[in-house]
């Protein structure tokens, strides 16, 4: 039975998503259905946690909107995710960045930037 579940999960996992970690600043394009219309809604913020693995993996994204902190828990295998763009790579020493909830203003989104090395030819 366990092998069957793994086989089904392997066929459902999305491979088109970038490599993301807590501390990264991302921009999500989410499909929103209102009545009969469908549109894309952007949600830009810092990943403060990720949880689970495989098809049950979720991320928590936090942003400050009009001075109020807004968090969204998003399942990564959701068909409502159109795209995920990594705007900044964050350098963190923690897996859960819940301490960002206590901060206000610009400090609420401040995470050190990770240096990304590209091989030179």
Swiss-Prot record:
Gene Ontology molecular functions: structural constituent of ribosome
GO biological process: translation
Pfam families, sorted: Ribosomal_L19
Record-level GO cellular component terms: cytosolic large ribosomal subunit
InterPro entries: Ribosomal_bL19, Ribosomal_bL19_CS, Ribosomal_bL19_sf, Translation_prot_SH3-like_sf
Keywords tagged on the record: Ribonucleoprotein, Ribosomal protein
Task of the protein: This protein is located at the 30S-50S ribosomal subunit interface and may play a role in the structure and function of the aminoacyl-tRNA binding site.
Family listed: Belongs to the bacterial ribosomal protein bL19 family.
Name of the protein described by the UniProt record: Large ribosomal subunit protein bL19
Gene source species: Chlorobium phaeobacteroides (strain BS1)
Lineage: Bacteria, Pseudomonadati, Chlorobiota, Chlorobiia, Chlorobiales
């Amino acid at each position: 039975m366990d092998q069957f579940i793994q086989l089904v999960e392997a066929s459902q996992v999305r491979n088109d998503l970038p490599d993301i970690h807590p501390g990264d600043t991302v921009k999500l394009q989410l499909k929103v259905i209102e009545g009969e219309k469908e549109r894309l809604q952007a949600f830009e913020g810092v990943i403060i946690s990720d949880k689970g693995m495989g098809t049950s993996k979720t991320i928590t994204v936090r942003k400050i909107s009009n001075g109020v902190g807004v968090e969204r828990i998003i399942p990564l295998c959701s068909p409502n995710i159109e795209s995920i763009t990594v705007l900044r790579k964050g350098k963190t020493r923690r897996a859960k960045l819940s301490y960002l909830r206590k901060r206000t203003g610009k400090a609420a989104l401040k995470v050190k930037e990770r240096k990304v090395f590209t091989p030179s030819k």
